Swiss-Prot record:
This is Glycine dehydrogenase (decarboxylating). The lineage of its organism: Bacteria, Pseudomonadati, Bdellovibrionota, Bdellovibrionia, Bdellovibrionales. It comes from the Bacteria. InterPro entries: GcvP (IPR003437), GDC-P_C (IPR049316), GDC-P_N (IPR049315), GDC_P (IPR020581), PyrdxlP-dep_Trfase (IPR015424), PyrdxlP-dep_Trfase_major (IPR015421), PyrdxlP-dep_Trfase_small (IPR015422). Keywords: Oxidoreductase, Pyridoxal phosphate. It comes from Bdellovibrio bacteriovorus (strain ATCC 15356 / DSM 50701 / NCIMB 9529 / HD100). The glycine cleavage system is composed of four proteins: P, T, L and H. NCBIfam families: gcvP, PRK04366.1. GO terms for biological process: glycine decarboxylation via glycine cleavage system. The keyword rRNA-binding does not apply. Its EC number is 1.4.4.2.
Amino acid sequence: MKIADLSPTNEFIPRHIGPTDSDIHEMLKTLGFNSLDQMADKVIPAQIRTTHAYADVGNGISEHGLLNHLKQMVSKNKVYKNYIGMGYHDTITPTVIQRNIFENPVWYTAYTPYQPEISQGRLEALLNFQTMIADLNGMEIANASLLDEGTAAAEAMFMAHSLCKNKANAFVVSPDMHPHVIEVIGTRAEPLGFEMIVMDPAKYDFAKPVFGVFFQYPNTNGTVEDYAAIAKKYKDHGALVTASTDLLAMTLLTPPGEWGADMVVGNSQRFGVPLGFGGPHAGFLATKDAFKRLMPGRLVGVSVDSQGKSALRLALQTREQHIRREKATSNICTAQVLLANMASMYAVYHGPAGLKKIALRVQRLTAILSAGLKKLNLEVGAGHVFDTVTVKTDKAAEIIAQAEKMQMNFRNYGGGKLGVSLNEATTLEDVEQIWAAFNLGKAAGFTALSVDESLADVTLPANLTRSTAYMTHQVFNSHHSETEMLRYIHHLQNKDLTLTHSMIPLGSCTMKLNATTELVPVSWPEISKLHPFAPTAQAVGLIEMIHDLEKKLCDITGFAAVSLQPNAGSQGEYAGLLVIRKYHQSRGQGHRNICLIPSSAHGTNPASAALVNMQVVVVACDDQGNVDVADLKAKAEQHKDNLAALMITYPSTHGVFEEGIVEICKIIHDNGGQVYMDGANMNALVGMCRPGVFGPDVSHMNLHKTFSIPHGGGGPGVGPIGVGAHLAEFLPKHSLVPEAGPANGISATTSAPWGSASILPISWAYITMMGAQGLRKATLVSILSANYIAKKLEAHYPVLYKGKNGLVAHECIVDVREIKKTSGIDVTDVAKRLMDFGFHAPTMSFPVAGTLMIEPTESESKKELDRFIESMVTIRKEIAAVETGKMDKENNALKNAPHTAQMLMKPEWNHPYSREEAVYPVEWLRGNKFWPVVGRVDNAYGDRNLICSCPSIEDYQA
């Protein structure tokens, strides 16, 4: 045996792909095939198959080799101390949070908590987040996170317009807001026809009515202003007031809710979440209770379960895009749950007193810094400040250069104005180094300690000083030792079913392995400590990796260019449609505003089209779930003068490779439109088909699905877009970092130049380790696994849609509608009963009501697939018992599911099935049982009696 025959023990492909080669052979045999290629010939239309070599993807490397390669690459980065601010600050992540949440697969592999009975832990952490946000900002209700500060501000603008009664289409933005936030607001405003007036709000004369006004608090210069009188003036004119805040500052400052704000937005990053070159971080939006039904994003509320016990759930879901489609309050589908939970745990760990102490220390250091700069005869900005000092100087360039020489970054406002924003990691020694930089390398001649001793206490005027208590709830005042914190984190995580327990077979979600090797680099300081607006020369290694990821994604998809800026799939849709819109405008065809969307589309599609002011025209689907090509052709021709785009998911939302995709694209192109492909199902294409070649002009790719970024319990996500050569010049840019996009591109859709940059290494690592052949095999095994499940279940449940050869793509839909007619058992009952078997339910009632969509992914072993199949077959037998009258139609194991340990231990058991049948319906559960901690949650009760923050979270554990 030669060395070439001895592959490294950490070769990644067999670690990622669940079924062994012998398993694959057996599964193929079940389907009547001898090889994966033979199966592929019957599943994937020949006209879209590719023989491309994927040279830029490469041949794959080992896990150990990957870590060494990436470490060499990012070692080119320069990790300086960052005092740039602008909503991004260095922070100290408590190690108990880093190790037990950020780096813990129980927290990062969970899905969005749509199944509340097996999600109570992260729902509680999110309720803590909402409470923290509402309390600190003096508001009544907050959502469970948004994508970033800029996106949150843009959502607030849209919400303000919806709430305003004066029918205005203009709004005022203070020029003292962070510039990147202004840019994102402007991006959102322009296609909607809103006029953004950037000027001093105090000087606006109201000659033109406005629906809102935006303030930064403290502002981008670091100054704390009293906005109460100005806010009242705008409210008197019918406008809504929005403030963008700094959470740490809110522990000391009068909260916006007390000076008239209707909405408050911001970024929770400095509560223990690393900088990460711009993200991911949890944005937030808080408002008044009266406005809750127009809030964007997810909202956790308190309800009760079937036993009358308090339980948490996602509330008011009728606002969301998956239900309201183009009439939704937002197109957002992904939040930032993992990062919101880190921030909320940071608040739990420090408590209100601890947070205030951190804030007071930052404030004191800022006062010391300011006093020292004045002693150096520098012109320091006037006004009350919290953490930022500005200096006017004619030596700005020399000072910036000196600071960089001393491995520090200051903010350069331009015009000889510099800024320094301090943070919780700043020390007295750091302050002295900052003085030396402003003194062009010479020591100040006095110490920070001496300045501190001579400086009076820092006080703010009474009107700017917080007097109200915050975070008084018990949860924020109980877990301050590491022992207590560790136990609280584990107490919560034990309530949640994640990929650490079992397969999560959610259709259209691709819950594949999030490999440890892919995730390890995210914590490296060469990545986590980079400020998004630091000089790009300091991030040369990470930017090299980003460009290589773009190159690999282009190679995989066949597109000419890729933008990694969109920080969610919904934002990829939005950015892609803006690119199409700008392309039409560049050709003098800006009037094109019709967007064709199949009736089966995911709700984000019409919601995104509405955000770019396109008119949605629905295209019919046939009985097999395929786009009705005749209807498409008729509508494309009917609207040919105004046709902007078609949005189509491929493979289809029904989990089938539609044979007519090339013809569909041609019809749109022949009528002047562009084709937007929703890439939600790209896990069935990689290595086999290249959408940029077979017809679509633009597509987003969900890196949190196909390319292994974890779902985080409902975020983060990344939704980059790939485009054809004719659209490349219109990809998103960023006004503060020109290198991030083309000069003629659309303006920024996210706050940071490369979006959620710190998690991009996850997808880069996945692609690099898998290589072209590994990616191809992953795709084929994902298709094989879906067809294996469909084949095994078709004798028990109808499989709703198949391709022309009787096969599905990477997911299958089982139909429960007839079962409901014969037994009264519905799709919800099946979903809840699966929890008793230790499984998360497949996707319920999408894309067809009364069905379950199953996507196993390539990462699940045959043993796990068989376990799921056995569970579904056993459930079908339980349904049969109801159908035959052997089991009661209402009092049965499905209607009463899930069963908790508390239910089991009650002395009375008034059910016609045994306790054993309830919780051990199959033998293998006896050795490894996941126990839901609440019974079936009452959704209607939760919406009727909405509580979205907690007087004491422990009250709901009783």
